[in-house]
Amino acid sequence: MIRKEQLYEQILEQIDLTKETDDEELQELIRTVLDEAADEEYISLSDKIRIGRELFNSFRKLDVLQELLEDDSITEIMVNGIDHIFYEKEGRIFRSKKCFLSQERLLDVIQQIVGESNRYVNEASPIVDARLKDGSRVNVVLNPVALNGPILTIRKFPSEAITMEQLIRIGSVTDEAANFLKKLVAAKYNIFVSGGTGAGKTTFLNALSNYIPKGERLITIEDNAELQIQGVQNLVRLEARGPNAEGEGAVTIRDLIKSALRMRPDRIVVGEVRGEETVDMISSAMLNGHSGSMSTGHANNPTDMLHRLETMMLMGIDLPLQAIQRQVASALDIIIHLGRLRDKTRKVLQIVEVEGYEDGRIQTKVLYEFKEEGMKNGKIQGCLMKKNEITNKEKLLAAGYHTV
């Protein structure tokens, strides 16, 4: 039986390392090696095509991961060492039959991905976040932290940003709620999108950002560039950078927020806040005349999101908790909470208004809430129901919206 690793080694031996081999030359070399192998042992045409494609991917692309990346129905790829490759499809986890030829080949693919993002990873610095050219999010963990071999996780993003109309069509949000949010964005309400891992926060923030008036100057700030803002001409995209091998040259989210404030922004969108940069997002951006700012955060519910914001602000500034709570209550207008339900669908579960600070705590009001109504054909039935009218209408009225 023809072994792919033997063919790989034969091709590697015949490549002229003194000059660059283009794609056409490589494909011709692969065909020649396959034809020679077919003279010794029968290879069907379909197998020839498959093996040829796999060999080309090994040299030019991301090896055995390439086919998974090209499958639009796959949303996540998980590599646990060379021969344990899993992927998520339609909410379910499957194991791939593919495997890397060696740990060295897997490490080559990892270094290729990380290098294209201007990051680095090695045993001295074994954890890194990066991204693919299409914006897909990548996380890498190496030995000695990863005990069973290199760990590579890729969360894929659609080639084109999902719109709010598409989210309405698949039932993630209702038309009524989306129209309400459209008015809030246009009226420059400060909005946080919360939810657990994989709830669709970045996707929803992308869709929400399409409601930003196209004539505004928008600055996006991210750890890894994932946002796909559409239609805004005056757009500035900033991406944080980790330290170099000498531990120098890091540019943090906090640094970028401070810099963005000097760029005359109409709005600032931060992909996700995780730590002390929350101080600058809340105190400097949202409370400093840049209404309409948006961000996301990990939380189990809107109340949890508020507590996490308080905790993250305490990490970055020495103020009493009461003062922190007052700042959060003054800065934040709306929390949109997303969830991934047991049928694997993603939905808006709550839209909550932050009313202010009173009686020693931040006061909130549920405006919309998802109400489950049972199961049908394995899918959860329900609707995002309006519960209350918004209290703080000043920004809506100033924007010309007299009915909501």
Region locations from a protein language model:
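N-terminal accessory targeting/assembly segments
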Residues: M1-E123
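Residue-level signature of catalytic and energy-coupling elements of molecular machines
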Residues: I11, I77, V140, L181, ...
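P-loop NTP-binding catalytic core
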Residues: D71, H84-A187
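Switch/coupling sub-region of P-loop NTPases
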Residues: K188-I191, A207-S330, H337-G339
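The Walker A (P-loop) glycine that initiates the GxxxxGKT/S ATP-binding motif of P-loop NTPases
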Residues: G195
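Walker A (P-loop) phosphate-binding loop of P-loop NTPases
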Residues: G198
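Conserved lysine of the Walker
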Residues: K201
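NTP-binding/hydrolysis catalytic cores, primarily Walker-type P-loop NTPases
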Residues: D343-V404
